[in-house]
């Protein structure tokens, strides 16, 4: 399936010089969304996975759909202050400052899911957060990997993705 044809390029958003990869058209296509849920993690033995952890906000959509498809739980990785206590928090650097994400503590094996991997800062923070909160990270996956911006791996494997730029 040609997923790139369902991802809209939005030039100069959110600021000049950036090309935003809008996955809204893909999400509106039930066949494409199902394809993503069934094919993004072909390399992972999901029998050992308890949860799909989605990074706010578009990662929520993908992870929740994948969790339902594979009959697993869903964990929200949220911006700080959005979840009731208790939570664990991790701060990380952004191009223009810092950010903080949080997750309820717990146990189990997770796959972390997000929409786009750019520099890897948010995804690495999510990995660190899951480990801090008591979870074991089985794999990480993104719909779109901007490979020209990163060479990120996890456990000596490339981050799973279905679309690369």
UniProtKB/Swiss-Prot annotation:
Kindly report the protein's main subcellular placement as a broad class. Answer: cytoplasm
| Pfam families per UniProt | Pribosyltran (PF00156)
Supply the SUPFAM superfamilies for this chain. PRTase-like
Look up the record and report any one GO term of the cellular component aspect: cytoplasm
Q: Name one GO molecular function term.
A: AMP binding
Q: Which UniProt keywords apply?
A: Cytoplasm, Glycosyltransferase, Purine salvage, Transferase
UniProt-annotated location(s):
Cytoplasm
InterPro entries (alphabetical) = Ade_phspho_trans, PRibTrfase_dom, PRTase-like, UPRTase/APRTase
Q: Please give the Gene3D superfamilies that the UniProt record associates with this protein.
A: 3.40.50.2020
What does the record give as the reaction this protein catalyses? AMP + diphosphate = 5-phospho-alpha-D-ribose 1-diphosphate + adenine
Q: Which family does it belong to?
A: Belongs to the purine/pyrimidine phosphoribosyltransferase family.
Instruction: Please describe the quaternary structure of this protein.
Output: Homodimer.
This chain's protein is named Adenine phosphoribosyltransferase
Organism encoding this protein: Bdellovibrio bacteriovorus (strain ATCC 15356 / DSM 50701 / NCIMB 9529 / HD100)
């Amino acid at each position: 399936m040609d997923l790139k044809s369902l991802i809209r390029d939005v030039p100069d958003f959110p600021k000049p010089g950036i090309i935003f990869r809008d996955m809204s058209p893909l999400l509106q296509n039930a066949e494409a969304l199902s394809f993503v849920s069934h094919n993004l993690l072909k390399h992972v033995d999901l029998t050992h996975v308890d949860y799909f952890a989605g990074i706010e906000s578009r990662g929520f959509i993908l992870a929740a759909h994948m969790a339902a498809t594979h009959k697993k739980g869903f964990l929200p990785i949220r911006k700080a202050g959005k979840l009731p206590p208790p939570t664990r928090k991790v701060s990380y650097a952004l191009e223009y400052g810092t950010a903080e994400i949080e997750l309820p503590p717990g146990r189990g094996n997770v796959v972390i899911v997000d929409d786009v991997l750019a520099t890897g800062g948010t995804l690495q923070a999510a990995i660190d957060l899951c480990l801090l909160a008591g979870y074991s990270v089985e794999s990480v996956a993104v719909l779109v990997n901007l490979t020209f911006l990163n060479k990120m791996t996890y456990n000596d494997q490339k981050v799973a993705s279905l679309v690369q730029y």
